[in-house]
């Protein structure tokens, strides 16, 4: 089970939101690169970056902070980024700058042809982010709810060559209420693309529950507010996941 610390960027700072609300941002660090280094020292094997400003305006907005993170740890572990990535030039630029994966969210929903082109041009580097509330996909920084069912949309991407799908339960994001295991497993079982869970991770019990369904196609989890608030120690969580993987 891949545990992936999240670094959400707003106005150049590392923040956490509640349920995607930009007005409910808690600043955890004014030095994102130092935060990235901290998570690597705690045993992180990948980092998940979100350009929050970019997600709302549709183009990159926290370039300096993102590049500082890549410079700090990009040679050691893979770094993935979502938020404001809606054209091929932006993808190419970020990959050239040292990102390992780019996450396409809104653009994948609104323009499947773009996603197909991105997978064709940058195979192995494209992850889709599907954010949902009550099973329905949301776009534009979670500000707009569509009529698309998550599983129906995800299955359409199977032939594209998508590396993984990050499934976020918006209602649980930042609320420390636990991962929506049932919905995550249901999505993973409905298709062949690996799923990364997101939204609500709160304690070691969540890690146990996720590891129990790893064989169903759930390959990782985004670690957000819990590892910043102290509710979950990241190093302990990674150690627990490794023990469960090894059957200990």
From Swiss-Prot:
Record bears the keyword Cell wall biogenesis/degradation: no
Location(s), subcellular: Cytoplasm
Residues forming the catalytic site: 8, 131
GO cellular component: cytoplasm
Main location, first listed in the record: cytoplasm
Keywords: Amino-acid biosynthesis, Cytoplasm, Histidine biosynthesis, Isomerase
Pfam families reported in the protein's UniProt record: His_biosynth
Full protein name: 1-(5-phosphoribosyl)-5-[(5-phosphoribosylamino)methylideneamino] imidazole-4-carboxamide isomerase
Provenance organism: Cupriavidus taiwanensis (strain DSM 17343 / BCRC 17206 / CCUG 44338 / CIP 107171 / LMG 19424 / R1)
């Amino acid at each position: 089970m891949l545990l992936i610390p999240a670094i959400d960027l707003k106005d150049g700072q590392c923040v956490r939101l509640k349920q995607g609300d930009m007005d409910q941002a808690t600043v955890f660090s004014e030095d994102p690169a130092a935060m990235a280094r901290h998570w690597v020292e705690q045993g992180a094997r990948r980092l998940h970056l979100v350009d929050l400003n970019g997600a709302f305006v549709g183009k990159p907005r926290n370039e300096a902070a993102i590049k500082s993170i890549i410079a700090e740890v990009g040679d050691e572990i893979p770094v993935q980024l979502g938020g404001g990535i809606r054209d091929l030039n932006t993808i190419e630029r970020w990959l050239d700058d040292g990102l390992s994966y780019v996450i396409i969210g809104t653009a994948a929903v609104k323009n499947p042809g773009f996603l197909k082109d991105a997978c064709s041009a940058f195979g192995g580097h494209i992850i889709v982010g599907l954010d949902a509330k009550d099973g329905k996909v949301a776009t534009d920084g979670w500000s707009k709810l569509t009529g698309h069912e998550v599983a129906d949309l995800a299955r359409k991407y199977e032939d594209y060559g998508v590396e993984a799908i990050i499934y976020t339960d918006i209602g649980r994001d930042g609320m420390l209420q636990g991962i929506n295991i049932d919905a995550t497993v249901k999505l993973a079982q409905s298709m062949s693309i690996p799923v990364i869970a997101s939204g609500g991770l709160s304690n070691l019990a969540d890690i146990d529950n996720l590891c129990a369904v790893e064989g169903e196609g759930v390959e990782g989890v985004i670690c957000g507010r819990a590892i910043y608030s102290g509710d979950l120690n990241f190093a302990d969580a990674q150690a627990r996941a490794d023990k469960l993987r090894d059957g200990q």
